[in-house]
A protein has these predicted regions:
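Conserved donor-binding/catalytic loop of nucleotide-activated donor transferases
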Residues: 212-214, 232-238, 243
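Conserved catalytic-core segment of nucleotide-activated headgroup transferases in glycan assembly
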Residues: 35, 127, 146-204
Length: 328
């Protein structure tokens, strides 16, 4: 693939009240809210783009005109799903990892010339491979992590501070009193200063600065397909104690009436260098004292895990190789 890659990524932003109103609304949003914060799908795109630049791999972003002028050139649609239908006929598509939560959410299967679907972890790939209405090759590809930006502080924090990262998506009326509140209370009881951060309520820079101050993070999320937030913490040298209940994928828009799939995990990329896991509140109370005692023992080397698996340029090259094989 010596020719430039045509990379596509767009957030849905349809007109709302009259044709073309999305453009002034975009400007007004920027003025009122500031620069948009990247979510997981945007982060896949940004980190792939950075990795391609570091690896010296030429690419063009959202160049529909250039694609049309290059007969048969593949389109690399990182996301989101609506972009698939914007690719002109005659161009094979590599799609992902910014796909819909489940194949049932889209209806372009069998019409678009999809040569490969990239999913960011194995359990997500397995669910897609099982439930796709037509046979399309799938593969696992997670984006790299920018370990230049996400790095440990020059000196370890003097005081013990713990971050509780709250990405509880569903059933909060039950899980906040049954899980989040007991976790917060146990951390506070141990004498640590507790920081509570809820997903979607912060700016990346504030999160990065907070990770310079804490000695560990408790990560609460039903499931993840890559988990940039906890990987960024690991890259900063912060060990993670992760709630990993396993079991079924429980997106309430699909489960249990339309889709049942298991097992899932909240930490698809994790080993003994990263920290520990617990299944429920009782298990947390059992493992929390041990986890605390191990923080200063040198047992955990979370940054080593990230640097050995999520190099930006290395993952960009892996992306190109997967695409090359699929298009051969």
């Amino acid at each position: 693939m010596s020719d430039p890659l045509f990379i596509f990524y767009e957030e849905p932003d349809p007109d709302r009240w009259f044709p073309g109103d999305r453009f002034p609304r975009r400007v007004i949003r920027r003025l009122l809210r500031g620069r948009p914060q990247p979510g997981g799908v945007m982060r896949w795109f940004l980190n792939l783009q950075t990795g391609l630049e570091l690896a010296g791999i030429p690419h063009r972003v959202n160049d529909y005109r250039g694609l049309r002028r290059t007969p048969g050139a593949p389109a690399h649609v990182v996301g989101k799903p609506h972009v698939v239908t914007a690719i002109p006929p005659g161009h094979p598509i590599i799609y992902g990892p910014g796909v819909a939560a489940h194949p049932l959410e889209n209806d372009f299967w069998g019409r678009a010339d999809l040569r490969l679907i990239l999913l960011s972890c194995e359990w997500f790939r397995a669910m897609y491979a099982r439930d796709l209405p037509v046979k399309i090759p799938t593969a696992v590809w997670p984006a790299g992590v920018d370990t230049r930006e996400w790095c440990p502080p020059a000196a370890l924090p003097a005081d013990r501070e713990i971050l509780v990262y709250d990405k509880i998506r569903w059933q909060r009326d039950r899980l906040v009193p049954e899980l989040l509140n007991p976790v917060m209370a146990a951390v506070a009881k141990s004498g640590a200063k507790v920081h509570h951060l809820r997903y979607g309520s912060y700016r990346e820079e504030d999160y990065r600065q907070l990770l310079q101050r804490v000695g560990a993070m408790v990560f609460l999320c039903e499931h993840e397909t890559q988990g940039f937030a906890y990987l960024q913490a690991l890259a900063c040298g912060v060990p993670v104690l992760a709630w990993d209940r396993g079991g079924f994928w429980q997106d309430p828009s699909m489960y249990p009436d339309r889709v049942k799939f298991a097992p899932v995990t909240s930490v698809p990329y994790f080993d003994e260098r990263c920290g520990r896991k617990f299944a429920d509140t009782a298990a947390f109370h059992g493992i929390w004292p041990q986890f605390l005692s191990e923080l200063n023992s040198g047992r955990y080397r979370p940054r080593d895990y990230v640097t050995s698996h999520f190099d930006l340029a290395g993952q960009a090259r892996a992306y190109v190789e997967l695409c090359r094989t699929a298009l051969a």
